[in-house]
Amino acid sequence: MNFVEELRWRGMLQDIMPGTEELLNKEQVTAYLGIDPTADSLHIGHLCGVMILRHLQRCGHKPLALIGGATGMIGDPSGKSAERNLLNEETLRHNQACIKKQLAKFLDFESDVPNRAELVNNYDWMKEFSFLDFVREVGKHITVNYMMAKDSVKRRLNGEARDGLSFTEFTYQLLQGYDFLHLYETKGCKLQMGGSDQWGNITTGAELIRRTNGGEVFALTCPLITKADGGKFGKTESGNIWLDPRYTSPYKFYQFWLNVSDSDAERYIKIFTSIEKEEIEALVAEHQQAPHLRALQKRLAKEVTIMVHSEEDYNAAVDASNILFGNATSESLRKLDEDTLLAVFEGVPQFEISRDALAEGVKAVDLFVDNAAVFASKGEMRKLVQGGGVSLNKEKLEAFDQVITTADLLDGKYLLVQRGKKNYFLLIAK
């Protein structure tokens, strides 16, 4: 399996330094990619980089995932228009442990193979580095003219923000450059990879190695992932789509992928899964024959949800989706945990009802007309119930005056009323 060819057909290759492909074809290469540790979870904006490390290891090379502990304390101006919040060491260590756990789902850190993945943290070699040593050993090799020529620096100096660029952020490219030098000297690392906005920082590292060691190293970057409509990938109205279920439930994670556009699904299934080329081509052809069946989106959502979470979480997400969009049963509704239930019915009208009244028993007609405005009138409700068009917790309401009690509550708190095929209402007992 050819690593560069793999990235190329998947649409994961932007820039590549001359000689990189030849090196990868000639020997087992140690390569690294930096990961920002400013949160204790990765989000899907990190996934392209993580998949590059995964493909690298699958092709027989050795991946190093570099946690930017030292650089995370400073902030990188690349692609940013403002200063970053700085982190303390305790937070960084916690974030590192959480991120490694997530990376272990994609990379083999445990086996004894020569290309076993490693996690490194640049704080470990930067924390004892004095300013004087850094200036002497690193600073003298790179000119200010060279640093000023970088696009990321130019953008910040010439941008609309009037706060300019701090010295701290200006020196970021030297710190990242030193990471490459350190890994070259200690791990034999000859290749750095990253997002296309990192090209300037990566080439600074290659230049530093050339000037200090006379060594030749290489670089490649992946393109910025966008949406077909030009919007930012991985962002929703409620923020990032996280890999940690504490921040983004597996159901919401699954729904994100399921709801991407046709053109995005065709690109994303190459980037965010390990499905082989022939199978993807067959899926694309199948999808084009019947786009309304959303075969690409369903397979994409399945693969990524299982990879990030588990098959069990994927199955639960499908079941939860069927409750709103399919022929689900009362049993499948009752299996939902509270967070998923609320996520599934996030957009439906909600009403508060009295728990005390339910404890004594309330007629459905009083509850759904007087207490919660599910129906405009008792006449409308009677007609719909008689026609079999009203369900409570996915079971047909048998009678207009059926008595409802706390025993009917889902999770001891909720009632789900369905009026007709598509109108849902969530009643919350308080």
From Swiss-Prot:
PANTHER family in the record: TYROSINE--TRNA LIGASE, MITOCHONDRIAL, TYROSYL-TRNA SYNTHETASE
PROSITE patterns given in the database record: AA_TRNA_LIGASE_I, S4
Keyword rRNA-binding: no
A molecular-function term among this protein's GO annotations: RNA binding
Broad class of enzyme this protein falls into: ligase
Record text on subunit structure and interactions: Homodimer.
Natural source organism: Bacteroides thetaiotaomicron (strain ATCC 29148 / DSM 2079 / JCM 5827 / CCUG 10774 / NCTC 10582 / VPI-5482 / E50)
Catalytic reactions on record: tRNA(Tyr) + L-tyrosine + ATP = L-tyrosyl-tRNA(Tyr) + AMP + diphosphate + H(+)
Enzyme Commission number, as recorded: 6.1.1.1
Lineage, broadest ranks: Bacteria, Pseudomonadati, Bacteroidota, Bacteroidia, Bacteroidales
GO cellular component: cytosol
NCBIfam families: tyrS
Keywords: Aminoacyl-tRNA synthetase, ATP-binding, Cytoplasm, Ligase, Nucleotide-binding, Protein biosynthesis, RNA-binding
Major place of residence: cytoplasm
Listed InterPro entries: aa-tRNA-synth_I_CS, aa-tRNA-synth_Ic, Rossmann-like_a/b/a_fold, S4_RNA-bd_sf, SYY-like_C, Tyr-tRNA-ligase, Tyr-tRNA-ligase_bac-type, Tyr-tRNA-ligase_bac_1
Subcellular location per the Swiss-Prot or TrEMBL entry: Cytoplasm
GO BP term (any one): tyrosyl-tRNA aminoacylation
Entry function: Catalyzes the attachment of tyrosine to tRNA(Tyr) in a two-step reaction: tyrosine is first activated by ATP to form Tyr-AMP and then transferred to the acceptor end of tRNA(Tyr).
Positions that bind L-tyrosine: 32, 172, 176
Family: Belongs to the class-I aminoacyl-tRNA synthetase family. TyrS type 1 subfamily.
Name of the protein this chain belongs to: Tyrosine--tRNA ligase
Classification via Pfam families: SYY_C-terminal, tRNA-synt_1b
Domain S4 RNA-binding: residue ranges: 362-429
Motif ('HIGH' region): 37-46
Motif range ('KMSKS' region): 232-236
